[in-house]
Amino acid sequence: AAAAPANGVSVAETRTWLAGLGGAVGEPTVRDGLTTLHVADQPLPWNLTFYACGPSLCDDVQFSAIFTGAITAEQVSSWNREHRFLKAFYTPAATPGGEATAVVQYDVVLTGTGAAQQLNEPTVIWLQLLRAFAERLVAAAPAAAAPAQ
């Protein structure tokens, strides 16, 4: 069995820290052995999933968000060519006329011990890149039709 991480953050402390910054942080959810915090920031909600967890600390986290709409594979490929840290994954619409999906992810390996404040810089980077990705999608969206007179 792998040794428990000596570095990282606890889920509870991270939730408290994010809420203290003004994030609308939900209760932790566990799915397939992974714990996730949903942050209902508007207009861009996102998730923080904890990996490589021991009894108290997790030393690997992933920020992620899901976008749906008139998204193209070319938009996602273009983003990935131009941006090193925030990676996007494209899923075409399941049905003709349906909405495509893009998932963006930012992985962070933590080398500090215990304090959620070690997430300061990664969180700032995440929020900047998340906003930039959303702005890129909006800028590429087809122009809205002029309102009927």
What are these regions (language model features)?
Residues D41-T68:
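Long, continuous compositionally biased terminal/linker segments
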Residues L137-Q149:
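Short, highly charged C-terminal tails/helix-capping segments
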Residues P5-A12, A70, T113-N120, V124:
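Soluble non-cytosolic domains of exported or imported proteins
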Residues A1-P45:
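Charge-rich, low-complexity N-terminal segments
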Residues V25, L48, A88-Y90:
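A structural signal for short hydrophobic beta-strand segments in well-ordered beta-sheet cores
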Residues L86-A134:
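A short, solvent-exposed beta-edge/loop patch
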Residues W17-A24, W79-E82, L129-R136, A140:
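Structured segments of extracytoplasmic/periplasmic soluble domains
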Residues D59-T101, Q105:
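Short, internal acidic amphipathic alpha-helical interface segments
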